[in-house]
Amino acid sequence: MKEILIVFIYVLGIAKASAQLRDHQHVVEDDSLRGEAIAQTHPVAVDDSFALVPASLQYGNPSFFKRLFLGKNYREEWSIPVRTRIFDINNTLGGLTITESGGGKQTHSVTLKDKTGKEWKLRTVDKDPTKVLPANLQIPVALDIVQDMISAAHPYAPLTVPAIALAADIPHSEPGFYFVPDDPVLGEYRRLLANKVMILETKDATPDNSESRNSEKLMENIMEDNDHRIDQQSLLKARLLDILIADWDRHIDQWRWGVIDTGKGRIYYPIPVDRDQAFFYSDGLAMKFATMRKLPFMKGLRYSIKKINWLGFSARNFDRMFLNELDETTWKTTIGNFTNAVTDEVITEAVGQLPPEIFPVHGPEITAKLRSRRNELSKAGMAYYKFLSKRVNIFGTNEQEHFIVSAGNGRTKVKVLGSDKSGMPFTIYSRSFDPGETKEIRLFGFKGNDVFKVHKSANDIKLRVVGGEGTDSFFFNADKRVYLYDGTAEASYLTGTNPKNRSSRYPHFTRYRPDDIDYQYNQAFPLINIGFNTEDGLLAGVGFRQHTHSFDKQPFASENRLTTLYSFLGKAYQIRYAGVFTDVIGKLDLIAAAELQAPALANFFGLGNETKRSPNTDMYFYRARYKYLQTDAALKYDVTKTFSVSLGPSFYHYWNNHSDNSKRILGRPELVGLDSSNIYSTKTYAGGRLNLAVNSINNETFPTRGMLWSNDLLHLSGLTHNSRPLARAQSDLTIYKDLYRSKVIGVLRLGGGHIFSDRFEYFQAMTLGANTNLRGYRKTRFAGSSSAYNNLELRVKVADIRSYLFPGTLGVIGFNDVGNVWMRNETSDTWHHSYGGGLYYLPFNIFILSATAGISPEETLFNISLGTKINLIF
């Protein structure tokens, strides 16, 4: 998620900086200067009971660039003074007493009690989004941008919701807007509340004024007693209202729950609270760009309902817990009743609740959008039903339940039974599944001695049975698409057809509560690499990284990376693919890689440790421009969290054209002991690769401690008549050591390799050079049958730069490299040395900008990189 935020904030940051430069605004460089004043406002007129006051003073008078990139949004609504009641703690509602303070990540709130004992909530309309950003983004540009994006939320939207909720028979509060003056009577809460426009509403918005529960209490109750249930149809109505008004922020803490005692159990009905994101909309270019793929759930209030699956992203786990029993017919009926109830007149009345000063700005437009969305709700709602129905979670409780799975008429039926104190069974859950809609059903028993009976499941529906804690019993007479997960240390009983048993001694997912189970969406992220070095010139490339998710596969089911890189000087390109597929066979991961270079930008000076480079010959002459395609696949087993073993096939294809090398060293191969007929013939190899790897570094981008150790054994057989077999071993060890409080980092690298084959091709040789292991020398400067190298590097943090656009860490690098290659029948004790240094910069501590120079007896070489690693080369 950090990558998403950084791309979004960087795009917005450029606009913000441009706006400030244009307006000559002062940039706050100290976070401590922010805080309590950020949400204050001041009235333009006051009488005994009312103040003419804007909701906020932060979002008005935007520059052209701010409007263009960050949007006009609802800035006028925030800035227009509105006749607002004045809050007087001694007189409002007959007098109130503050009992506690609270609030979410962005709002400040207090709980109050009136003289009858009824509780009320008073919370800010404006917000402080500081806490929503991770620590590395707690910098001025990010704080200013995220603060400014509050203008995309309509400050008075909560006033419009009750009329729609009333028409649709959804419990709701009646919010009132108040201006809280700087009143000494507020005591210790004065600093928190003074000079703010706030919303006052009842804490328990139940129709009968009975006490409601928060979601945490609800989860405790429904887990401990299986006769406590959710009114799912009422919840669906409330979620349809969320979709209608584009309220995307509907996670589990945005709800309270009323209770109906039936005499045989309790039914909890939902009460939506905190309608702060209703009508959310930004027309800025930055938000439009971000919502294309990165933040699609924030598309906001448009005439059409876009990407309904993503609109429910914040409620992805919530919906899978509490909308899992409703079938297609119930959805259609509920949606139909909802759209019929929310008439044009209801929408007009609802939007008409906006203050008269505010309505003319966007009121007519909001009315038109709501009517249009209402008309699309049947289609969008059923699309969301199908999305939720693809994979369905069915939960038990901490008591004993009987899960019964059967089939008939091409459908799979799941029933969950509990029992009362007399032992009489009652139905907790019942639903029939269509294999055309549902691909996977997951049963979670949690605690209790649960019983699972699987008579038969529809062939196209995968069934996962998660026993949980307790002595569970399993009776299976099913096809092969049943997977069992239970603790092997627990006494469980299994009879009948054996399922695919995924039980383990430490089944972490069997001990969760339903709200602990996180459903992740598949996502793709853009990648970019930009660099410069003396040999390759300007390098630029783009790509993407994709994550897919599946049951109990952490941190993802698959990761796919596809990157490209182009050398403008060498007129060459490369395409790289890397894939990881988690637990494809038991706990074995599948890893795959492929690389195409056309041509490779390698050098060749001959074989041996003391090959000469003519001072009168241009480097162009030593370029070896051949092409190759390499692919690898392997099964990887993680022996520990830091040690892995992988084994699999490898393929290599080489081809070369004389026309690409006519004026280069490969155009005169006899100078370096090569045969022209051999170097221009196509060669294909296939074989296997064994890799042993240790990875204990603490950060992939900029490690400060840990170890990377890769040991690689490769054997290839020739598939063409002139392709010789190759056997090669390589080892590379890098140790990162924090020498002083993460400010001084020592890096030690040792490595080398050996070719066991008697003969090998020039492009297969062990090499030293460039930025790989001997900086200051050209790429692949030395080539032989064996190699050894040592790199010693010191990275010293110089300062934390509090730049507005690119705050980050600035440091210096110093290094010394030494290496040697050997050839059979050659005697050489020469070790090649180089040294150098440079600067690195870590904006947001997420990616690296580096500039280094390597100095050798032959020349000085420069490298500038922007990406995820120091030293980008082709």
Residue locations for each model-derived region?
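Residue-level signature of outer-membrane beta-barrel architecture
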Residues: G467, I530-F532, Q546-T548, Y566, ...
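C-terminal catalytic region of ATP-dependent kinase domains
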Residues: H26-E29, I150-S151, V259-S430, P435-R442, ...
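Transmembrane beta-barrel strands of outer-membrane/channel proteins
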Residues: I528-F532, N560-Y566, L590-N609, L647-H653, ...
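Outer-membrane beta-barrel "beta-signal"
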Residues: R689-L690, T860-F874
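Outer-membrane beta-barrel initiation region
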Residues: D283, H455, V466, D472-L590, ...
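Outer-membrane beta-barrel translocator domains and adjoining extracellular loop/strand segments
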Residues: P555-A557, Q574-Y577, A602-E610, N657-L666, ...
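Conserved ATP-binding subdomain of kinase catalytic cores across diverse folds
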Residues: R85-E216, A246-D247, I267-N309, F313, ...
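C-terminal outer-membrane beta-barrel translocator/porin domains of Gram-negative envelope proteins
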Residues: Y519, R576, F605, P615-Y622, ...
